[in-house]
Amino acid sequence: MAEFATIARPYAKALFGLAQEKSQIESWLGGLEKLAAVVQEGKVASLIDRPETNASEKADILIDLVGLKDKELKNFVIVLAGQKRLSILPEVYAQYQDLTLSFNHIKSAVIYSAYPLTDKQVGELAQMLNKRFDSELKISVEIEPELIGGIKVEVGDQVLDLSVQGKLSALYTTMTN
């Protein structure tokens, strides 16, 4: 959601800045990942949305569920709870993860394929894409049967569409204009 992204951005940047100061970038990434996963669970999500549960109770429950030990991360959860923003934790995690990748000079890439790819195919694609985008890429693969065949690659805001669906769409656009 674009709205959550806008709200989460300053929180992610502030937390990342603090993590840099404390040399805790990677460990806090793990804590945020756990928090984001827990917040998306049905019972926890309904608890967060319940107005009769006060903010400190919500924060304490989340901290206990995840088993947070780090003082700054606990304080972060308490601040989010106090501002009724616990539901944006998954987006904060996603943006924090992007900041971490950027800090490590790594870009995130998603390869969409109509069919499952072998490890060898993913490795070969990774080599070609690393050269093409002149950067180390963290690659994830998602299956999208509607592509019909071929692949589509997203790196940041760049899209490389080599799918049959993409070619058919381009052909349709050309024929209708």
Curated annotation (Swiss-Prot):
Keywords: ATP synthesis, Cell inner membrane, Cell membrane, CF(1), Hydrogen ion transport, Ion transport, Membrane, Transport
Annotated localization: Cell inner membrane
Superkingdom of source: Bacteria
Record InterPro entries: ATP_synth_OSCP/delta_N_sf (IPR026015), ATPase_OSCP/d_CS (IPR020781), ATPase_OSCP/dsu (IPR000711)
Membrane protein topology class: Peripheral membrane protein
GO CC annotations on file: plasma membrane; proton-transporting ATP synthase complex
Keyword Membrane tagged: yes
Any one GO molecular-function label of the UniProt entry: proton-transporting ATP synthase activity, rotational mechanism
PROSITE patterns: ATPASE_DELTA
Main location class: membrane
Record family assignment: Belongs to the ATPase delta chain family.
Function: F(1)F(0) ATP synthase produces ATP from ADP in the presence of a proton or sodium gradient. F-type ATPases consist of two structural domains, F(1) containing the extramembraneous catalytic core and F(0) containing the membrane proton channel, linked together by a central stalk and a peripheral stalk. During catalysis, ATP synthesis in the catalytic domain of F(1) is coupled via a rotary mechanism of the central stalk subunits to proton translocation. This protein is part of the stalk that links CF(0) to CF(1). It either transmits conformational changes from CF(0) to CF(1) or is implicated in proton conduction.
Subunit structure: F-type ATPases have 2 components, F(1) - the catalytic core - and F(0) - the membrane proton channel. F(1) has five subunits: alpha(3), beta(3), gamma(1), delta(1), epsilon(1). F(0) has three main subunits: a(1), b(2) and c(10-14). The alpha and beta chains form an alternating ring which encloses part of the gamma chain. F(1) is attached to F(0) by a central stalk formed by the gamma and epsilon chains, while a peripheral stalk is formed by the delta and b chains.
Protein name (Swiss-Prot/TrEMBL): ATP synthase subunit delta
Top-level taxonomy: Bacteria, Pseudomonadati, Pseudomonadota, Betaproteobacteria, Neisseriales
